[in-house]
Amino acid sequence: MADPSNAALRSGLNNRYRVLEVRVVRGEGRDPEKHLAVSSDPSLGDTELCVLQNGWESVPVVPGDIVHLEGDCSSGTWVINEQSGYLILYPDLLLSGTTISSSIRCMRKAVLSERFRGSECGSRQTLVGTILHEIFQQSVTNNLSPEKVEELAKKIVYGQKYLKEMYHLKLKQTEIMQEIEEYLPSFFKWTEDFVRNPANQNKMQLKLPSENKTGDCSSTVEIVDILDIEENIWSPRFGLKGKIDVTARVKIHRQGGIQSRIMPLELKSGKESNSVEHRSQVILYTLLNLERRVDPEAGFLLYLKTGTMYPVTGTRMDRRELIKLRNQVAFYLMHSTYKSAVGRQQSQLAALPPLIDDSQACKYCSQIHNCFLYSRAVEERMASVSFPPALIPIIEKETQHLKPSHLEYFSLWYLMLTLEMQSGDSKKGYKNIWMIPSLEREKAGDCVGNMIRVDQVQEVSEGQYLHSFQRKNGAVPGANLLVGDRVVVSGEENGLLGLATGYVREISATKISCLLGRNLSKLPESTTFRLDHEEGDCSIGVPFENLSKLMKDSPVSEKLRNLIIDFHKPRFIQHLSSVLPPEAKEAVASILKGLNKPQKQAMKQVLLSRDYTLIVGMPGTGKTTTICALVRILSACGFSVLLTSFTHTAVDNILLKLAKFKVGFLRLGRAQKVHPDIRKFTEEEICRSKSIKSVTDLEELYNSQPVVATACMGINHPIFVQKQFDFCIVDEASQISQPICLGPLFCSKRFVLVGDHQQLPPLVQNSEARDLGMSESLFKRLEQNQNAVVQLTVQYRMNSKIMSLSNKLVYEGKLECGSEKVSNATANLPNLKMLKLEFADASKTWLKEVLEPDKPVCFLNTEKAGCRPSDIGIISPYRHQLKVITDLMARLKENRVEVNTIDKYQGRDKSIIIVSFVRNSNDENLGALLKDWRRLNVAITRAKHKLIMVGCVPSLRRYPPLEKLLCHLQSEAMIFNLPPGAHESIHKCNIL
C-alpha cells in the first residue's frame, strides 16, 4: 500500500485525518456500523470518533489510511450517514469524473485506466467528439451566427491543430468535415431553443434538491451567459478533478418565478442515451462546482447529434453513492501492494477489483489486454482470487503467447514501478499545491507565490496563451523556476486550484512569462497567483504502457521479449560489404578518417548488427562525436534513424553537431524544451514556416527526414504509429530505467544503446524497488552479451593526473589520453601571479599550493579548518546545498560560475571543477549518495585541467568508494590539510 506516514494532517476545511483503528459495531436490531478512531494531530495524540452508518460502513478503510471528513463534528464525534456528511478516502488522489463513472459497470477497468493511461487510444469517434466540443464551445462563447459557425468548423478541421491525430488515424480532412456538418443543424436548434428564444422551448421537468414543493416542476431553461469553457477544477475536499465543458449562467423560468444558477453543461457527441454513466459525470461536476461557487444543485447533459438537453439533478443520494464508488477506486489504487503479516516482509502486488462476468463487455473493453495480463501474471497464483468460468479460456487464449519468464518480468516490473510511484507521491504530486502554503514551497525552491497578472494576454497559437506575471511586492526568486519548466498556475485563495498548466517561457528579475493552455484574463485583476513547479504524474503512465506493450502478441514485442527477457544472443552479419552500398563507401571512408580506433570499431559493429549494439562511452571519450558520426554513416547508407535520449539536452547536443554537417533531421518535442539553435528543425516551427495544413503535407514532412530525434518520453507521437526505423540510437541509456528505454525500441528494427553503467544509474527513490533491481538499466542487463559490446577508451577531456583517479577507482587502467597535449594540459590562470601577492601571509600559503596549475588534483582536508558546507562548492551530491551555494555566489555578485548536482553534470565538463563533499563527522547517517561509486566516478571525471575536492577526510573514509579514492590521493600526496580558520582567509581576498 501507499506509505501515508508523511502525509500532512490538519483540521479545518481541507482536513486530513489518519485512521488509527477500525471497529465494526453490531447492535441488536440495528444495521452494522463502522467506528473509526481518527486523528488530525501530527503526533496522533488527540483522537476523534467517526461513525459510519446507513451504507457508509461498506466503505473500505483500514488503519493507516488518510481520510477527509465533511459534515458536522459534535464533541469530537463525526456521524456520517444517509442524510449528512461524507468520508473521502485518500482525498489528495484526485480522480476524474470519467474514471468514477466508468467504475459503475466495471471497477477493474477504472483502476486499470488510471495505471495504463495510454491504452485509451484515439479513435475516429473520439477525434470527431473533440472537434465538435471545440466548435460548440467557441460558437456559444462568441454567440456566432450559423454562417460563422460553418466558417469556424472549416477553420478548425482544415487547420493545424488536429492534423497529427488525423495522420495517426489515417483520416482525411474531407471525411471529418462531412461528419461534422451532420451535427451543425442541431447546434443551431439548441441555440435557438435555449439561448435566443427560450420561451418557445418545450418545458422540462427540473426539481432542485433545495425545493420542497411537490407536483409540477416543469420549467423553461434560458442560457444567459457562458462564463467559461473547459474550466479546470481540482477538489481536494472530494478527491475529484475535472474539466467542465461549459460553465453557464442559467435562468430557470417557472410559475413561481425565476431562479438564477451557475451550472455545468456536459457535452456528448456519441449516441443519445441519457445513461447512468453520463448522468453521473454531471452530478460529479455539481460537486466540483462547490470548490468555487454556490451549489448549483443540478447540471445539464447535451447530446450534440440531436440537440437534446437533459436536466440532471445532483441529489444527496446520487452524490453519496458516487463518492462511495470513488472511495473504492481510491482504495484499490492506494492499496495496490501489501506486505504479508507472516514470513518475509517483501511487498507483493494486491488483487485488482474482481473481473465482471460479462464476456461481451470484455470483448470491446480498451483494457482487455492489461486486465487478462494481470490475471495471468499476478492473480492466478492467489488463493483468494477466482475468475468467472466463462472468462478462463478467453484469458488463456489472450495470454498463451507469453512464457512464464515473461509473466515474471511483467509482475516484477509492475511491482517495482508501483513501489516507486508510491514513494514519489510524498515528494511530488499536486497535493503540495493545496497542502503547503506558497511561501513555504517557495523556500524549498518549488514555487513562486504572490504574483499578479500584468500586460495583455496574447494568443500565441491555437489554445496557447502567453501570460506575464509580476511579484506583488519584492523581486522574483531566481532559482525556483527555469525556462522550459512545466508549471501549474493557481490562485492564492482556496478554490482556485489548478487554473491552468503550461510552461515557463521567459524569466527576468521582475517578471515571469508563461505559455498556458487557458486564458486567465477573465479573472479579476486583483487575483493573486502562485506558480508551482509541476512534478506531477504526467509521465506516470509511460513505463506501465511500455511494459504492457512488451507483452503484446506482435512480432516486434516478441523479438524484444526474446532479446531482453530471455537473453537470446544478438545476431550479426558476417561481411560489411553486404550492408554498405557502393555509392556510400566514399562518404563513409571520409567520416571514419576523423575517428580513433575504438570509435571506428563501434561504427563497424553497429553496421553489422541484426539486433543491437552496446557502446560503452567512458568519461571524455567523445560519446557525442561517436553518435554524430554514426548517424552520418547510417544516413549516408540510406538507413532511417531514430535518435533519442532521456534528456532534451543530450538529444540537442548531438543535433548541434549534426547540423554542422548538413544532415537533415526532424526534432520532435515542445520548442520551449529545445536548444534555441535547433528550434528551426522542430515540427512546430517547420509546420508554421511552411504553413502545413493538410494531412498529406504532414505525411510528406514525416517521410522527408530519415533522421528523427526526440526524448524517450516523446514516443507517444503519432509518427511512431506508422513509421518503423532501421536503427534506434539511445544516448544516456545507462541512466534510463528499462520500461522507459523500451519505448523507442518498439519503433525500430535494430537498436544501439550508448552509455556507461559505471556512471549514473537510473534514479530510484524507493529502497525496496532498488533492492529488487529497478536501478538496473537495459544497458546493464544486456551487457552480459559481450559480443555486442564496444568500449570507447581513448579520452580527450582529462589530463593524466585527473584520469588516474577514475582509472584506479573504476576502469582498471583501461582509460588512456588521446594525445600528449591532453595528457599534460593544465589550467590557464592568467591572474595567478597577482593573486600570489595577496596570499603572502602564512594563513594563505595553502591557497597558493592549491591554485598551482601543475598540481591538477587537490583534496582539501577540512578536518581542522572548521569550513562549513556553505563556504565552498560547485558540484555537490545534495540539492539542498546547491541553494546555499547559489545564494552565496549571488551575494558575491558572481553569476558566471555554474553550481549543480552530480546528476546534472553527467555528460558535461569544465576546465576547473570544485567538488564539495558536504558530510561531516556530526552526521549520524551515512549518505546514500556518497556510498554510490558511480556518482563519485561522474564527479571526479568532469574536470579537464584541475580538480579540487573539499571535505573532511575522517568523515568521508566511512564511505567505501571514498576510502578507495582517499587512499590513492594519499599515496600520490594530493591531500592538503587546511589550517584552522582557513575559510576566513578566503573571504578576505578576491579570488573570484
Curated annotation (Swiss-Prot):
UniProt keywords, alphabetically: 4Fe-4S, ATP-binding, DNA damage, DNA repair, DNA replication, DNA-binding, Endonuclease, Helicase, Hydrolase, Iron, Iron-sulfur, Metal-binding, Mitochondrion, Multifunctional enzyme, Nuclease, Nucleotide-binding, Nucleus
Decide whether keyword Nuclease is in the record: yes
| GO MF terms, alphabetically ordered | 4 iron, 4 sulfur cluster binding; 5'-3' DNA helicase activity; 5'-flap endonuclease activity; ATP binding; ATP hydrolysis activity; DNA binding; metal ion binding; nuclease activity
Q: Could you say which enzyme class this protein belongs to? A: hydrolase
Region of interest (Helicase activity), ranges: 489-992
Where does the record say this protein resides?
A: Nucleus; Mitochondrion
Cofactor(s) needed by this chain = [4Fe-4S] cluster
Signal peptide interval? none
Just give the chief location class. Answer: nucleus
Domain of life according to the entry: Eukaryota
Q: Where is this region: Nuclease activity?
A: 51-488
Say which family it is in: Belongs to the DNA2/NAM7 helicase family.
This protein is called: DNA replication ATP-dependent helicase/nuclease DNA2
Source species, please? Answer: Gallus gallus
- Coding gene? DNA2
